[in-house]
Regions:
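A glycine-/small-residue-rich N-terminal strand-loop-strand element
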Residues: 1-15, 19, 78-85
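Adenosine-nucleotide cofactor-binding segment
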Residues: 114-120, 129-196
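Rossmann-fold NAD(P)-binding glycine/threonine-rich loop
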Residues: 212-229, 244-247
């Protein structure tokens, strides 16, 4: 451990080996050992980070956040200022870098281009705010929850569409002079919505699908992919480098450009079931479990 000392405040994110071809190219989200390190629940050698009464306790992202203490490796951690409320910052290492990074690192829209974001949970709102930061003149939010669409408007959406009440493709084309958007981001993982994100593209547009579905999606390879030159891509964790992207998002937050805290609500750990229910219902976009109830932010 070279970059941290006891008492540092940190945000935790995924682990990348740092030594494989893709890591050395600067794309740790494509680490050749990503799955075994982050999704297997154990170390690459099969041993567990934690045990309870002699039994293995699996983890997630090589660190696990639902715990009072955890064991991490240096690449899991991002040092953050002690002048910030640490309770707010945890989601920066996952959902917020995924949504914003998909736009800032992968799609890279130019000022004046247009983007539609399907799903206005934390990941979708992060993508939407990144579209605004990038200078998109149309930042269109699509959802079926009016409460979430209201917040999307507050956070910078130029237009909102409740796709339960109107045809999203028709509405998007109306907002873009009949062309469609240059970029679309699907955060829903709903097959039909993913297909809609492709139909809503302008010629030469790109749809980034960053949520998963167990179902196949239908893509018109002739009209959409060939004639209209559209592209459909997958993106993992926003192609982010947490040690770069998390501080960047914090700076955007300081400047009032990335108000991620407006999506958050604190819950005691004993309220975990209520937090889960509020997340499912859409009442709370980003529930945060505060395990240390004695923590006081004094910044």
């Amino acid at each position: 451990m070279q970059n941290f000392v006891p008492g540092d405040h940190v945000v935790l994110s995924f682990y990348a080996c740092g030594n494989c071809e893709n890591c050395l190219k600067g794309v740790p989200t494509q680490c050749l050992h990503y799955a075994e390190n982050n999704l297997s629940g154990v170390r690459p050698d099969g041993s567990a980070h934690f045990t309870e009464n002699g039994h293995k306790v699996c983890d997630m992202f090589d660190q696990s956040s639902f715990a009072t203490h955890t064991i991490v490796r240096e690449r899991n951690a991002v040092k953050v200022s002690k002048n910030l409320d640490l309770r707010k910052l945890g989601p920066l290492g996952c959902g917020y870098v995924t949504g914003s990074g998909t736009v800032l690192n992968t799609l890279k829209p130019h000022p004046g281009q247009t983007i539609a974001v399907f799903g206005t949970g934390a990941v979708g709102l992060a993508a939407m705010m990144a579209g605004k930061i990038s200078g998109c003149t149309r930042v269109i939010a699509v959802d079926i929850n009016d409460g979430r669409l209201k917040l999307a408007k507050e956070l910078g959406a130029t237009q909102v569409i409740n796709s339960k009440n109107e045809n999203a493709v028709e509405a998007i084309k109306k907002f873009t002079n009949g062309h469609g958007v240059n970029f679309a981001v699907d955060t829903t993982g709903v097959a039909g919505v993913m297909e809609t994100s492709i139909k809503a593209l302008a010629q030469g547009g790109v749809s980034a699908c960053i949520a998963v579905t167990p179902h196949h999606i239908d893509v018109d390879t002739w009209n959409d992919l060939c004639v209209d030159d559209k592209a459909v891509i997958g993106v993992n964790m926003g192609d982010s480098i947490p040690q770069i992207d998390v501080p960047r998002l914090i700076e955007f937050y300081r400047q009032g450009m990335f108000d991620f805290d407006k999506t958050e609500k604190f819950y005691k750990f004993s309220e975990i079931n209520q937090a889960n229910a509020d997340s499912i219902s859409g009442k709370t976009i980003k529930p945060i479990l505060v395990i240390d109830e004695d923590y006081k932010f004094e910044g």
